[in-house]
Amino acid sequence: MIALIQRVTRASVTVEGEVTGEIGAGLLVLLGVEKDDDEQKANRLCERVLGYRIFSDAEGKMNLNVQQAGGSVLVVSQFTLAADTERGMRPSFSKGASPDRAEALYDYFVERCRQQEMNTQTGRFAADMQVSLVNDAPVTFWLQV
């Protein structure tokens, strides 16, 4: 399971002209689900995403996680993160989970975030989405479990 996380000052996702999720300061989480992923991996990734210390403390050091910084989370499904790009000029998606499995694990990940009392907003799984963000600094990390 893969999360591309970006520290943002604001972010939103729109589907068919409707805003489905919007946050102020916090994390935009682009989530990719691979074939061998399961709930255990989703739990570990959620723990890492919410605990990752990429927000500045009073001394300007990256020492706070999103909860400590008072931020929110916007989770957007992105199957292209599971692409195999090692060769050729076209990505292969053979490493990606089936749509049903990916949606179930995406929903599970979102619910785990909410159980941690995070303000968690979402896109719409498998929809054609427009994602807007203001990347803070920029700060972007690839987390994989």
Swiss-Prot record:
Official protein name in the record: Probable D-aminoacyl-tRNA deacylase
Catalytic activity: glycyl-tRNA(Ala) + H2O = tRNA(Ala) + glycine + H(+); a D-aminoacyl-tRNA + H2O = a tRNA + a D-alpha-amino acid + H(+)
Keyword Protein biosynthesis: no
Annotated GO biological process: D-amino acid catabolic process
HAMAP family in alphabetical order: Deacylase_Dtd
Subunit record text: Homodimer.
Classification via SUPFAM superfamilies: DTD-like
CDD domains: Dtyr_deacylase (cd00563)
EC number: 3.1.1.96
Source organism: Shigella flexneri serotype 5b (strain 8401)
Compartment(s) of residence: Cytoplasm
